[in-house]
UniProtKB/Swiss-Prot annotation:
InterPro entries: Galactose-bd-like_sf. May act as a repressor of nr2c2-mediated transactivation by suppressing the binding between nr2c2 and its response element in target genes. This is Nuclear receptor 2C2-associated protein. It comes from Xenopus tropicalis. It comes from the Eukaryota. GO terms for cellular component: nucleus. It is found in: Nucleus. Keywords: Nucleus. Belongs to the NR2C2AP family.
Length: 136
């Protein structure tokens, strides 16, 4: 059975926050489990979320919930060990919907994981993400 590898000591970073308003749209809302909060990127191509784990973790699934109209057609998942360079694990292709989407890939051991949103469905390149979880 797979379980979340995210914890209170997981460090996260994002490419941008809409209007730099971290109180309303910051990265902390990706992981809070509340339906009414979200991370909202600013405009621009190739938005991303990076997670750093305190030790190596095994990952095999990612769960995402976008706001329809502000999702992504192609995502790249990359990972590495502590000081290594990120290498591609998988590409996946979310639908432009509000529902929770689950993607499975070959199990990998990583200490850093980056999800890159390569082409947003929004004309300005914004991403709105209500939920992100990584399981292994």
């Amino acid at each position: 059975m797979v379980t979340s590898v995210l914890s209170s000591v997981t460090i996260s970073r994002v490419s941008s926050v809409l209007n730099r308003d971290v109180k309303q749209f910051g990265k902390q809302f990706l992981f809070d489990g509340r339906e009414e909060t979200c991370w909202n990127s600013d405009q621009g191509s190739c938005q991303w979320v990076l997670m750093e784990f305190p030790q190596n973790v095994l990952v095999s699934q990612i769960h995402l919930q976008f706001q329809g109209g502000f999702s992504c057609q192609t995502c790249a998942l990359e990972g590495c060990y502590k000081d290594g360079e990120l290498v591609k694990i998988a590409d996946f292709y979310p639908e432009d919907t509000n529902t929770l989407q689950k993607f499975t890939f070959a199990e990998q051991s990583v200490s850093k994981l980056r999800v890159s949103f390569l082409n947003s469905t929004d004309f300005f390149g914004r991403i709105t993400l209500y939920h992100l979880d990584v399981l292994g």
